[in-house]
Regions:
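Amphipathic alpha-helical interface elements
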Residues: 1-171
């Protein structure tokens, strides 16, 4: 199971990095500038995401990260996307421009009831994927994972509801 989750994670990261640069003038607007992200995201959220990415990059011991830090003036998006932890990657995606999130939703056929890209489902699914991946990596029981209630006690983050309607009655 972990093998396939890692494949999905790598695919989503790669596609997001590609689309992120494409939507930012083919990488001319670097990932560490706030205008590379959605105008709907708060400045605080964008700055937190960029700061987390910088922190994780600076702690990386990977040779290619060290090479870029020593020999170049900036770290390319693909390296940042590859190196940051899954939670930070999800934050990068969540704060990305609408064209990025909608392209990923379309790629995985994640639509809402009005046939619009369902970014909430995408982000929620990635958080669940992260939790399942972490459980597998630590040899924990996957069936014991449960959703914790959101801080505001709302039903936000409920990602299974749309799938129930799609399941056959015999399931």
């Amino acid at each position: 199971m972990l093998k396939y989750i890692n494949q999905v994670e790598e695919e989503v990261r790669t596609l997001t990095g590609y689309k992120f640069d494409q939507c930012n003038d083919n990488g001319k607007i670097p990932w560490y500038e706030t205008n590379a992200y959605s105008s709907n995201a708060t400045l605080q959220s964008k700055m937190n995401t960029i700061s987390s990415a910088y922190s994780e990059l600076s702690k990386s011991k990977s040779e290619y990260v060290q090479f870029y830090m020593k020999n170049h003036e900036q770290i390319p998006t693909w390296i940042m996307i590859k190196v940051v932890n899954f939670s930070t990657f999800i934050d990068v995606l969540h704060n990305s421009k609408t064209n990025v999130t909608h392209a990923i939703c379309k790629l995985y056929s994640m639509y809402d009831d009005h046939n619009l890209p369902n970014v909430k489902l995408l982000i929620g699914s990635l958080h669940w994927l992260r939790r399942v991946r972490n459980s597998c990596a630590h040899n924990e029981r996957v069936y014991c994972i449960h959703q914790t209630q959101a801080r505001n006690n709302s039903a936000s983050g409920r990602i299974l509801d749309p799938y129930y309607a799609q399941l056959p009655t015999s399931y």
